Structures are given as structure tokens and as C-alpha cells.
């Protein structure tokens, strides 16, 4: 008889949408997160403890980004700012394994937003484990399309 593990694994599957990104230099510099969506999974089961928020970026959404996510400037006018939800968001993700497709993009934006608060908040990977599902997919399916759409098909 084998012993069953009693370790609790808490994962947060997370995605962000942004006002855009830079092609040169830091991809996040001067841009903002406008949506955070996160789903909690404990021991491989959905808990229903999700985190979702739209954010007012105090800048316009680039047309290219709007073409990707369809989130309009007008829709965001009455939403909270990142600063207003930062503590709740940090409490939600703290200690979890974050599972993010193309994690460098989202983590770059998250760390940038935290840095703008001027509160000496450490990098996300110091209080969360980060797993990049794109990197995992590339290892599992080398040479294949690894977009979320392709992986879900």
C-alpha cells in the first residue's frame, strides 16, 4: 500500500490584459494592466475562489491591444486603479503557484505595476512560484503551435 500525499497544492491560473506593449525595450514600460483574471485550483480542483477585475489605466488603450481583447477606454473610466486593488490581489496570489501562459509578459506587467506603487514590494517570483505554461507546452510539443487556442483544440 502506498502512502497518499497530504500536501496541499494551491495554484492560480492567471491572465492579464493590458493597454498595449512596447516592441523595443521593456515590453511593459509606460503601459498598464486593464484586466486581471485568476482562477484558484487546490489539489487539482477548482475552488470557485476566483479573482477578476477591470482596471482604469489612466492612459488610452493602444488600437492594436484593443484588437486583441476588445476592451474599450470608455468601459474602463469608472473602474478602480491597480493601486486600489493591489493589496487584495497580492493577498490572493501570495504563496500560490501561478500558472501563466507566456508568464514573462504578465509577470513583467505585474512587477512594473507593483513598482509604480513605490512601496518596495518584492518581485512576484519571491512570494509566488511561477510556472509558464507556454514553456511547458514548447517542451511537450516541440515544433507545434503552442497558443492557448491551439493547445485547447
Task: Annotate each predicted stretch with a short phrase.
Residues 129-139:
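Short, flexible loop segments at boundaries between secondary-structure elements
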Residues 2-127, 142-153:
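Conserved non-catalytic scaffold segment of RNase H-like nuclease domains
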Amino acid at each position: 500500500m502506498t502512502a497518499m500525499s497530504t500536501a496541499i497544492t494551491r495554484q492560480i491560473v492567471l491572465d492579464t490584459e493590458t493597454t498595449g506593449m512596447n516592441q523595443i525595450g521593456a515590453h511593459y514600460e509606460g503601459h498598464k494592466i486593464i484586466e486581471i483574471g485568476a482562477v484558484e485550483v487546490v489539489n487539482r480542483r477548482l475552488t470557485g475562489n476566483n479573482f477578476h477585475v477591470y482596471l482604469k489605466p489612466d492612459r488610452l488603450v493602444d488600437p492594436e491591444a484593443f484588437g486583441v481583447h476588445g476592451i474599450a477606454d470608455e468601459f474602463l473610466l469608472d473602474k478602480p486603479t491597480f493601486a486600489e486593488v493591489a493589496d487584495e490581489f497580492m493577498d490572493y496570489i501570495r504563496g500560490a503557484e501561478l500558472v501563466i501562459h507566456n508568464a514573462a509578459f504578465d509577470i513583467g506587467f505585474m512587477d512594473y505595476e507593483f513598482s509604480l506603487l513605490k512601496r518596495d514590494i518584492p518581485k512576484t517570483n519571491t512570494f509566488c512560484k511561477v510556472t509558464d505554461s507556454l514553456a511547458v507546452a514548447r517542451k511537450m510539443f516541440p515544433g507545434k503551435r503552442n497558443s492557448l487556442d491551439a493547445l485547447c483544440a
